[in-house]
Amino acid sequence: MIMDYNRAVKDLNGMSKEDFLAKVCEIFDVSEIEHAADQSEEQLRPKQKGEYSMFLGEKWYLCRLKEADKNPDPVKGLDVSLLQDLLLDPVLGIKDPKTDDRIDFIGGIRGLKELERRVHTDCAVAFAMYPTSIGELFAVADAGLLMPPKSTWFEPKLRSGLFIHEIRQEDTNDSSR
């Protein structure tokens, strides 16, 4: 199963929470999730492609991609790419998520409570992603392109060495196989 691969960012690039939220509202349709503390993690998660749940301060917000920002390109149209291209790079200054120390990636199996914990300890904002679909994964592969970093979290994890078969000398000399 493909699960979400969430993001936590250590700072707001010099902005206050209010200024950052205003920037987010310019990019997404944003609504505060009322009574978030009383809701289950499932209720706080994004429900469809183009939605992100954001934890900022002590509040959860649902951020919906505006129609004009949707992209038919198999890689640029992925939710992880859109978040990177529309918000993380231009607003938070995270040019390369592979090398920038200000962003951390949290596998979906760890849950939204881990995102809250990170914002309460060492991060300023966290984003819960809608999981990349198998169809999106195949579309990227069929186009001969590469998935963005940290865009998929697979469960269950395959055990290391599960598909390794030892080749012994006698195996290569045995022509009866």
List each language-model region with its residue ranges.
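Surface-exposed, charge/polar-rich loops and edge strands
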Residues: 1-177
